[in-house]
Amino acid sequence: MTKPSLILIGGGGHCKSCIDVIEQENKFLIAGIVDINRFISELLGYPLLGNDDDLAKLKLNYDYALITIGQIKTPAIRIRLLDYAKSLGFKLPAIISPRAYVSKHAKIGNGTIIMHDALINAGVIVGDNCIINTKSLIEHDAVIENNCHISTGAIINGGAIIKQGSFVGSNAATKESIKTNEKDLIKAGSLFKGYANE
């Protein structure tokens, strides 16, 4: 059976990591990359297909896309591109590394990527357009809302709620059952204990 083709929207460093996961998952063929940088012609052997303005034309030939721009300070660009891709009719699949563990009792949203060696336990809900990065741990019953980035080695303990648009830095950890604010930024290496009014 022929694998469907997938367009990657965004051609930076995060895109390289996404390419490796997509190749390992082996469910999609990468058609190429869409990026505003006209100075690149390819990335890891995949061609540049155009920029954001070409997506409507590309939709005539391709059904699937993934947002492959990273997220640190703000999710705004990822959200804008997601909304645009959806408005054109692209399907945005969840991509899960075969080296990750995702419980059969967890739920993963559309357009989310689960990177190598991530661990997602039972009862977890991960929303749409999220990055669950390499070696991160999402413990039982935690909720990661839409458009979040859980960075490399971060630990989200049981029952925690990471509100939409938030970023949890590398090797940061949360206490159990806490709740962040929307678009929160938890610094790398820190322990987030929640807010005083919880």
Give the predicted meaning of each segment.
Residues 25, 82-85, 148:
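Glycine-rich, phosphate-binding/catalytic loops in enzymes
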Residues 13-14, 73-76, 107:
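Short alpha-helical
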Residues 40-97, 101:
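Phosphate-bearing ligand-interacting subdomains
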Residues 19-21, 78-81, 126, 198:
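Short amphipathic alpha-helical segments
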Residues 10, 69, 176:
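Small/polar loops that bind or transfer phosphate-bearing groups
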Residues 94-198:
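Structural signal for interior beta-strand "rungs" in well-ordered beta-sheet cores
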Residues 1-43, 56-59:
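Hydrophobic, well-ordered beta-alpha structural blocks that scaffold small-molecule cofactor pockets
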Residues 31, 63, 164:
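Conserved acidic residues
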